[in-house]
Amino acid sequence: MESNKKQTLSIKVDPFNTDFAKRWSWMSLGKTLLNAAELHAKNRGFGMYNVNSENCTWVLSRLCVEIFEMPVVWDTVNVCTWIENIYRLFTDRNFSIKGTDGKVYGYARSIWALIDYTTREPQNLEQMYGDDFGGFLAPEEECPIRKQGRVKPLDNDCWVKDIKSEYSDIDLNGHVNSIKYIEHIMDLFPMSDYENGRNMSRIEIAYMSESYYSDILSLYKKKIDDDVYEVEVRGRKDDSDSTLSQMNTLVRCKLFFK
C-alpha cells in the first residue's frame, strides 16, 4: 500500500501522446508530471480547488527532468510524486517515472510557489501550510539526479525567432502554460536532431516571469557543447512602443541530448 506521503499516477502511453518516433512526447510527459502533482495535492487538501478558494494558485518555478530511456507507445508508466521540503516561499516536489515492472525511466525535481491570484505575490507557505505539510514530507525518498544549475543570460545575437502567444498557450492561471514553453523550445531544433534514436535526455528550466495572451516571445539559443544547449525566452507586449530594454526574461533553460 502506498504511504500517505506519496501519490502515483498510472497512465498508458497512447499513440496521440507520442512523437514521430513512437516515443512518449516531452509535452505529454510534462503534463503528466503536473497532473500527478495536482492529484497528490488535491488528495491532501491543498490542490488547486482548495487554494483557489483562498484566491491563490500554485505556479511552477523550477523544473528539472532527466530521462534515462523514454517510454514508447503502449507502455504503462507509473509517475510517483512526493514533497521533499517546504520553505517560506517555495516547496520542493520530486518525481519518479517507472514502468510497471519497476524499470526506471527517469526522475524529476521541481520547485513550486503559491501566489496570490490578484497581486501575483508569493505567499508564506510555512504560515499557511507548515503544520499540515509536516506529515507529507518525504525527504528520505530517493531522487538520484543532480539539482539544476544556473543559466546565464544569453547575448542578443543568439536570437532565433519571435512567436506570438495564442489561445492554445494560455492555461487556467491566465498565463502561458509552463509545458507550452517546453514545446516552443523543442521546436527550435529541426526534426533531424531527434532522428536516429537521438532525443533530449535532460532539461533544466527556470520560470522567471509570467507572459500572457498576445505577448511576443523571443527565443534565443546557444550551443555549449555537441549535446548541450542553453535557451532563453524573453517577452514583451505586442505594440510598437515595446523595445528590447522593455523585454522581460520569462524562461532560461539548459538542454542535454544523447
Spans of features found by a protein language model:
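HotDog/MaoC-like acyl-thioester-processing domains
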Residues: 2-9, 64-146, 207, 211-213, ...
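Acidic/His-leaning functional-site neighborhoods
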Residues: 157, 161-254
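Hot-dog-fold acyl-thioester-processing enzymes
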Residues: 1-60, 107-109, 116-201
